A protein has these predicted regions:
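Single conserved hydrophobic/aromatic residue that forms the stacking wall/gate
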Residues: 1-7, 11-12
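Beta-strand elements within well-structured catalytic alpha/beta cores of enzymes
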Residues: 99, 147-155, 180, 191-200, ...
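A glycine-rich, aromatic-flanked flexible loop/lid motif
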Residues: 106-118, 144-159
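Active-site regions of oxyanion-processing enzymes, predominantly non-cytosolic
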Residues: 19-22, 63-65, 137-157
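Polar, surface-exposed loop/tail segments
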Residues: 249-267
Length: 267
C-alpha cells in the first residue's frame, strides 16, 4: 500500500481532500512528489516535478526528482505505472554517450532514459511493468540489428522490493526465468546478455528502503567462455566499460573513468 511508503493514512487522506501533493525524500539522493491521478492529475504532477528539478541543483542538488502518482484501490491506495524520473544530467561523459558519439544505437526500455536524462539514448519506450518491459525488449531485438538495448524491470524494485512482498518477488523472478528462453532464441552468435542490478531491495528485510548487498553479474552469450568466475568487482562501472569495449572494439580514453573492462576474462 502507498501509505507504508510515504506516510500515514491521514497524510494521504489530507492530500485527497486538499489536492496538495505529498513531498518526501530518501537517503539515496531522491526528492519525491506523490499525488492522486484523480485529484491532481498527471500533467500537474509532472509540472510540479519539473519545477522542483530546476530548483534542486547546485548546492541543493539531488540525483532524481520522482513523480509518484497513485490511485484509489479498495479501501487504500496504489501507485500506478505513470511514474516519471527527472534526473540530473550526467556531469561527465558516460558509456552511453561514448556509444552514441561512435554511432552505436542505444535503446532504453522502461525508465532508463529518465535516469540518464536522455544522455546518449537514441530511442526509448515507456513500460507498464516487468511483463511489458520484457516484451518491448524482444521488440527492439527484432528492429535493432546492432547496439545496446538497456532494460529496467521496475517491478522488482517498486512493486515487490520496497513493499516487502516476498511472494510477489518470487513470482516475478519465476516469470523472468521462464521468459529467458524467448530471449535466448532471438540472440545471434554475437549478442551478449547481461543481467545485473544497481542496488539491493531485499523483500525479506525490515523496513522499506533499498538494502545493501553485492549485485549479481550474470552473463550469457554463445561466444563467451563458460563458467567464468568474475570474482568481486571493485565497482559497478566495470560492467559499463566492458560493454563499451565490446561494442567499440576498445575503451574510450577517459582519465576520469573509474570502471575497468573485464572483456578479456570472458571472451
Amino acid at each position: 500500500m502507498l501509505r507504508s511508503l510515504v506516510g500515514s493514512e491521514m497524510c494521504i487522506r489530507d492530500s485527497m481532500k486538499t489536492g496538495y501533493p505529498i513531498v518526501y525524500t530518501s537517503a539515496d539522493s531522491v526528492f519525491q512528489i506523490a499525488a492522486s491521478e484523480e485529484k491532481v492529475g498527471l500533467p500537474r504532477l509532472y509540472e510540479m516535478c519539473e519545477i522542483a528539478r530546476k530548483i534542486l541543483v547546485g548546492e541543493h542538488g539531488v540525483g532524481r526528482v520522482i513523480a509518484r502518482p497513485f490511485v484509489r484501490k479498495g479501501d487504500g491506495f496504489e501507485r500506478t505505472s505513470n511514474r516519471r524520473d527527472y534526473a540530473l544530467e550526467p556531469s561527465e561523459h558516460n558509456v552511453l554517450v561514448h556509444l552514441a558519439d561512435a554511432g552505436v544505437r542505444v535503446c532504453g526500455v522502461g525508465k532508463i532514459s529518465d535516469i540518464f536524462h536522455g544522455s546518449g539514448i537514441c530511442a526509448s519506450v515507456h513500460t507498464t511493468g516487468n511483463t511489458d518491459g520484457m516484451q518491448k525488449t524482444l521488440d527492439y531485438m527484432q528492429t535493432e540489428p546492432a547496439g545496446l538495448i538497456f532494460t529496467n524491470l521496475v517491478d522488482f524494485d517498486m512493486k515487490y522490493g520496497h513493499r516487502r512482498d516476498t511472494l510477489g518477488y518470487k513470482n516475478a523472478l519465476e516469470e523472468f526465468d521462464a521468459w529467458l528462453p524467448k530471449l535466448y532464441a532471438q540472440m545471434t552468435d554475437e549478442d551478449i546478455l547481461i543481467v545485473d542490478a544497481d542496488h539491493g531491495c531485499d523483500p525479506t528485510f525490515k523496513g522499506t528502503d533499498h538494502t545493501r548487498e553485492y549485485i549479481p553479474i550474470l552473463m550469457y552469450g554463445k561466444g563467451l567462455k563458460q563458467g567464468t568466475d568474475l570474482g568481486t568487482r571493485p565497482t559497478f562501472a566495470d560492467i559499463g566499460k566492458t560493454v563499451e569495449e565490446y561494442l567499440l572494439g576498445s575503451c574510450v580514453d577517459d582519465e576520469k573513468a573509474i570502471g575497468k573492462s573485464f572483456l578479456q576474462d570472458i571472451m
